[in-house]
């Protein structure tokens, strides 16, 4: 209904991390208007290997989370980056780029205040534990992009997708983690541009 009201005839669907299941379901339900599916470090099956502490975020009060984040911020951008990115090489890629550093800082704070997100956050955790998607029903061109050092969403999720979708391919970014859009943004953009360009051409 939204696409109809906006008079948009076709789309590329992008699903990142926990947004992957929604994008996948859209591609399955509306193949006639989906030019391509982009699965970006996305969940495609049950999320059993969760990172330590992820679920406890929703248990923190707004003040507690603000205090933790503020201490990290006062300690400097280096601390904020190392808090989420374990690989020193990736940390350096972010720190030497002021634009990416500022974007990273904004992303760091994006889950606060948790009180506005708590209900949805906990609902996601519950649903992702027993996630079951009919991946074999995806018929549109599909690309799965994933870093091989992602400890938040294991690369096995993208491998699962690419193994079950006939018209698909997987693009693995070496040395990249779940925050690779800050450290490997150029490589990611190039892979996305190529996928979209190729599938726009093929539709004519």
Which ranges hold each PLM region?
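Conserved alpha/beta-hydrolase "acid-adjacent" motif
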Residues: 151-157
